Amino acid sequence: MTVAHQQGIVHRDLKPANVLINQESLLKIVDFGVAAAHREGDTQLTKTGYVIGSPKYMAPEQILGKKVDERADIYALGVMLYEMVTGVPPYSRGDHMSVMYQHVQGKARVPQEINPNLPPGLSDLVIKSMAVDKTKRFQSMEELRAALERYK
C-alpha cells in the first residue's frame, strides 16, 4: 500500500478478502475497483450521498463523505489488525448502517480487554490505527509498518 499511496492512490476497500498471501508469504493487495487518485487540494474522492467500500472496514471520514486519503486505508488495516489480535470485529452489531454508525462513534473495546495476552503496546497500536480523527492515526503505511516491526 505504501507504493500505491506514494502514487496518490487510495484503495478505499481494503479488507481481508482483498489481501492475498502467496506461498512465499508475499502479500498482494487486489481489487482496486473503487480506488481513487488523491491529489493535494482534492476536497473529496466520492460524490456526496454515495458510500463506497465495505462497511466493516470503512473509515469514519469515508462513511461521512468527507475528504479521504491514505489514512482511510490505514484505518481499514487497523480494523483487520483488531480482528487478528482479538478474533472478533470491533463493530458488528446490526445492519450495515448500524455498523457504519459504530465506526463513526469509535467506541470499540480495547483489544487487550478481549485478549489479555497481547504484547505491551500492541493494543495501543491497533487503537491508534483506528482513531476516528484521522490526524490521530498513523500518518502513513510506512509509519505503521515501522511501529509493527517491534512485534515480529
Identify the residue ranges that each predicted region occupies.
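Protein kinase catalytic-loop region centered on the HRD/HxD motif
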Residues: 1-9
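Conserved catalytic/dimer-interface elements of ABC ATPase nucleotide-binding domains
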Residues: 2, 20, 28
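Short connector loops in the HATPase_c
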Residues: 6, 24, 39, 93-94
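Catalytic-loop of the protein kinase fold
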Residues: 9-16, 21
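Activation segment of protein kinases
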Residues: 24-60, 64-67
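C-terminal lobe helix-coil module of Hanks-type protein kinase domains
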Residues: 56-152
